[in-house]
Amino acid sequence: MIWVRQSDDTGGVWFECLPTTAPPDTLLGMVQRGRGAGWLAAVADPVEGRAALLACLTDDPRWDHQVESRAEFYASLAVALEVSAADIAACGDINDEDHWLVAETLTALSVRGDSNARELLAQRIPDTWFEDLMAEPTLPFPPLNAPLSALLGNEHLVSHHDLMHRLRTTTDPDDLAALHEATRDPNRRGFRSAMLALAERGDTSFVTQVGDILAGNPVGQPRAGFLGYLPRLPARDSLPIARLWFGLPDSRDDAALQVLALHATAQDVSAIRARLAVSESTYDQCDLVEALGRVPECGPYPELRTVFTDACYSYLRRESAQALATTDPDFANTFATECLWDCEAGTREVGAKYAPATEQVQRRLAELAADEDEAVRDAARRRLVGPPAR
């Protein structure tokens, strides 16, 4: 086991014990990472594949348990390898958070129609798990045409899609006054939404304040509002500032990375590649990889292939697949096919768009036409009647 320093947009920091991941070129290492190549290798070697699957379910290999997808990946592999629901349930107590992947995989099997998985879940999950979910919501929600000052004070509405649209587009003087009032106190409800909305409106009046605050490495909820401000500004305003902040030893660098992920140009490539070569932060790597994907004219970038094969974080592999698809002419013949079996929907979607039209790919596209993810389904169905993307 290894201890890894984790953090989030609010500035929270903690240390988490993560499983040791096998080398990326081994069957176990690929199955742990959720790679399509791992799924295919496991099916080709059922004995080793079964052992790898059960090892992953016993010792959850995910770098981020909250967001990384594995349950459907492991459930489909269990079906292909004829691993029973009982074998999966034996990998850990599903009421122990260290083994929630077992419960998630059993759930994925039950959705596929496995009655044994459904019965095992019913036996082991306490009824109290569902009591809060079944309760009728009773929170008071003001109508979205209410005064903006009232809406920004409601913690359950501050990120509502329609409210954010109103914040971005309103010309009402009272609304604008309420919007600016909400930025006065970083600890008040609505602060983050107000800051993001003003940035999207092109209001650059907070740049100096945001830079000063981020230089002090703020923590807690206010950090998210300050950190999200610069990336929401138009590129003409944010990119010059991001280039100045890039590499600074404080939270300004985090904001700069987010801007480069959205708006990098050829001018930024050398600095991005140099940073990617030495970066040990998975979240930073995600932004750096996405930034390279914005500049296909300077590619291909060999380091993106290494990120694709080695990344333990499946979101990072998804970002590298998307970047490779636009920057590497050989992507269709190297990684695109395995992407069709990847654990992450975004990576499967990339594969559906770019994989060559082989018999194996056509069969897999027919399966993905019924994928759980709508974007994957749409991409697969388009490919079944059309050529790969270029």
Task: Tell me the role of every PLM-derived stretch.
Residues 362, 375-376:
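A generic membrane alpha-helix/interface feature
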Residues 1-20, 28-51, 55, 62-83, ...:
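Structural detector for internal amphipathic alpha-helices that build alpha-solenoid repeat scaffolds
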Residues 122-126, 366-372:
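TPR/TPR-like (Sel1-like) alpha-helical repeat modules
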Residues 24, 50, 173-176, 207, ...:
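Core helices of alpha-solenoid repeat scaffolds
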